[in-house]
């Protein structure tokens, strides 16, 4: 055994997953390694560095298409990482829909990527990448689809810039999945403490850099989903109000709104409070929400 192998065992380095092993969380893959997180939207690229200790550090935003940003910033981005490793969140060119009766087989994301028809059946389209979030209490699922051509374009641009992609995700969908998990835990606790009273309907509002996903549920069944990319800005929130209005108007006494938003959370919360003054709002938003999700999971 080489001395280097002994030192790896003593330091537990040999038990750490490789950076390109997507079956592990980002936090485990980059223990004591610097990495960079990027969020791609229509108007530009936001980024946040992660230290070797796993802490979020310097950040920034540059307007313009990804190709131009990488040409300008590739050296700086590389310097913020160990060996050029990055994770990317796409905030455009995706669709989230509500589907019924999809298979609940224990299939990995690799199976969904390689043979989506085995999971989605006739709903599978050529040239798409998919991800799923199932409702454990009903036959409904939230389905994310992204153009495969767009994913390949991102991969090609990063490779040409000397950077490595460890993960590509959709920020809104990741935040939706996190929200649904928290709602499921809260619902279980509510049932344990309240055997007679029924939990009211829930309107989940997910907002990430102007893109939104709104999911309505009644008695733990998902009944309606609306998703829009680059819907609103800080200067023009009216499009968000328009899409929310019919769903908010359907809320009854005892229903509630669950909000999970990025930096624009206070603006969205103010809008919801004005639209539904008598409805309870559970705001689970956190500072740097998308960056925290990307750096840990």
Predicted regions and their residues:
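Hydrophobic/aromatic-enriched cytosolic interaction surfaces used to assemble or bind macromolecules
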Residues: 1-297
């Amino acid at each position: 055994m080489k001395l280097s192998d002994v030192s790896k065992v003593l330091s537990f380095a040999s038990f750490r997953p490789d950076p390109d092993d997507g079956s592990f969380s980002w936090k485990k893959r980059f223990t004591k390694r610097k990495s960079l997180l990027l969020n791609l939207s229509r108007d530009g690229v936001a980024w946040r560095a992660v230290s070797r200790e796993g802490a979020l550090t310097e950040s920034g935003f540059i307007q313009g298409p990804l190709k131009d940003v990488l040409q300008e910033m590739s050296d700086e981005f590389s310097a913020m990482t160990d060996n050029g490793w990055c994770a990317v969140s796409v905030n455009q060119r995706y669709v989230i829909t509500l589907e019924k009766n999809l298979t609940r087989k224990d299939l990995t994301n690799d199976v969904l990527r390689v043979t989506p028809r085995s999971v989605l059946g006739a709903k599978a389209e050529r040239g798409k990448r998919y991800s799923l979030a199932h409702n454990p209490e009903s036959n409904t699922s939230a389905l994310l689809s992204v153009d495969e051509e767009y994913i390949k374009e991102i991969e090609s641009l990063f490779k040409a810039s000397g950077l490595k992609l460890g993960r590509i995700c959709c920020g809104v969908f990741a935040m939706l999945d996190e929200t649904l998990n928290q709602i499921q835990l809260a619902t279980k606790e509510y049932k344990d403490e309240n055997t007679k009273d029924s939990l009211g309907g829930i309107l989940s509002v997910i907002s990430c850099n102007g893109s939104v996903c709104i999911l309505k549920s009644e008695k733990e069944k998902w009944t309606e989903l609306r998703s829009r990319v680059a819907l609103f800005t800080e200067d023009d929130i009216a499009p968000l109000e328009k899409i929310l209005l019919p769903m908010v108007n359907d809320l009854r006494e005892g229903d509630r709104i669950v909000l999970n938003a990025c930096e624009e959370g206070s603006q969205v919360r103010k809008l919801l409070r004005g639209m539904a003054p008598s409805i309870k709002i559970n705001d689970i938003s956190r500072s740097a929400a998308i960056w925290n999700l990307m750096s840990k999971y």
